[in-house]
UniProtKB/Swiss-Prot annotation:
UniProt entry tagged with the keyword Nucleus: no
Keywords assigned: Lyase
Transmembrane segments: none
GO molecular function: lyase activity
Coiled coil: none
Functional summary from the UniProt entry: Covalently attaches a chromophore to Cys residue(s) of phycobiliproteins.
Protein name according to UniProt: Chromophore lyase CpcT/CpeT
Keyword Cell wall biogenesis/degradation attached: no
Family: Belongs to the CpcT/CpeT biliprotein lyase family.
């Protein structure tokens, strides 16, 4: 792995992101959401990895998404692999209090097939990420089993996310924003944790 480019990308993609401005400007269209992508110590999984939570601002101790993300690089592509965590409830709030993650490596991870994100630099400091091809990333949504389409644009200041789910049998859109992408601003960065000693 080319360490320096990987570390620079890790700084960009990690942090606390909030769409507060978007939600305040359009409260009927957009909920106020925070995304936390917190770097873990390298020794946790012997690789570059992150603990992620997504939550509504009004319910910060009840995240609707928790995952481990492992970062790797293949030539010019950065791969953000997604994993489910065994007994994830034990680690709720770990994005806010890292001490809650001390024993996370003792619990099994389950890779989410088809759900890795592939990021490529489109111009200096700006990256476009798309979910791996094949429509094999599945999410249960109510009684529906859906496949996911996802696109993320990110730089050191902003993360723009477009996620949607489609019925497997009909390809009909089942979930996702009806009013365009979610626009998040980075409000906290974790650069101090990511340097040449992050290994």
């Amino acid at each position: 792995m080319k360490k320096k480019p990987t570390l620079e990308f890790a700084k960009i993609v990690s942090g606390v992101f909030s769409n507060k401005e978007q939600a305040l400007n359009n409260p009927k269209k957009f909920a106020h959401i925070q995304i936390h992508i917190r770097p873990l110590f390298f020794k946790t999984y012997n690789c570059f990895a992150f603990y992620s939570e997504q939550r509504y601002q009004h319910d910060i101790w009840n995240p609707y998404r928790q995952s481990i993300n492992k970062l790797s690089q293949e030539e010019e592509i950065f791969i953000f692999s997604n994993y489910k965590i065994e007994d994830k409830e034990r680690f709720t709030g770990g994005a806010l209090d890292i001490s809650l993650l001390d024993k996370i490596s003792k619990y099994k991870l389950y890779k989410k097939p088809g759900c890795s994100m592939y990021f490529k630099e489109t111009n200096p400091g700006n990256f476009l990420g798309t979910i791996e091809s094949g429509c094999k990333c599945f999410i249960e949504y109510g009684s529906d089993k859906t496949y996911v389409k996802s696109k993320v644009t990110v730089n050191k200041n902003i993360l723009i996310s477009e996620d949607s789910g489609y019925a497997i049998e009909t390809d009909k859109k089942v979930w996702g924003s009806e009013f365009g992408p979610l626009i998040f601003k980075k409000i906290i960065n974790f650069d101090c944790f990511i340097n040449e000693y992050w290994k």
